[in-house]
């Protein structure tokens, strides 16, 4: 019997965890058997709905947007990761996407549900510095950008796993989802028409990773700028070299380097994928590592 809103919030998170725990092995089985992953998408979609209900209930329970402590931000990140996964799968409904992305949402909600003590899972009043309309603008955009960058980087990791030293042609782009068109000469009339050519699995992953990371990078930029404006309003300084700020800048630079290699150098395949995987590690340090230090304005506190 669920007697309190807190118990219902945690139960919704646990239910989403169970669904993702079921979805992950099914996704890997679908990849190995080369079958469709419709059931996996259904499980992830229902889990996302449960996370949505969890966040709404937590918002009602606490009286503020549910992103003010580590538990709430992990639940929000799980919601954003599963939503990003569903959007990417809509562009390319392959079980490889589910196999690559589902572990991230699962890891976030598992950490929130099982690794954090009850006092960090409980709702608490906002500290005065966070009682600002910038909270929703800055933190939510940063968290959604993390979700897009994490999912995009996991797709890059999938490129490294599926790549067998294949050379990718420079024919995929950030626009389009399933293939490209090339000029083909028609023998009987000599006219030129556009003929659709399907991308390989590796090219699809490479293109989807690039597009997802591009969206995440743009949102990260907006999040950092909005945070600087908020900091200036609250403390009179745009930048204070707080540990989280420093690592957010490092994260931005890593993904800026990734996009530079794609746009200016024309890299595709393994080389930019390696840069994206470095970004995956940097996000982990920026998001979780800073909290282990227990210092800085952005730290959610020491929890060990």
UniProtKB/Swiss-Prot annotation:
Q: Name one GO cellular component term.
A: plasma membrane-derived thylakoid membrane
UniProt-recorded Gene Ontology molecular function terms: heme binding
Q: What is this protein called?
A: Cytochrome c biogenesis protein CcsA
Q: Which UniProt keywords apply?
A: Cytochrome c-type biogenesis, Membrane, Thylakoid, Transmembrane, Transmembrane helix
According to its record, how does it sit in the membrane? Multi-pass membrane protein
Has keyword Transmembrane? yes
Annotated localization: Cellular thylakoid membrane
Its annotated function is as follows:
Required during biogenesis of c-type cytochromes (cytochrome c6 and cytochrome f) at the step of heme attachment.
Asked if the keyword Cell cycle belongs to this entry, the reply reads no
Record note on quaternary structure: May interact with ccs1.
The UniProt entry, under InterPro entries, shows: Cyt_c_assembly, Cyt_c_biogenesis_CcsA, Cyt_c_biogenesis_CcsA/CcmC
Give the source's domain of life in one word.
Bacteria
GO BP annotations, alphabetical order: cytochrome complex assembly
What protein family does this chain belong to? Answer: Belongs to the CcmF/CycK/Ccl1/NrfE/CcsA family.
The UniProt entry, under Pfam families, shows: Cytochrom_C_asm
Q: Which organism is it from?
A: Synechococcus sp. (strain CC9605)
List where the protein spans the membrane.
11-31, 37-57, 63-83, 96-116, 141-161, 212-232, 246-263, 275-295
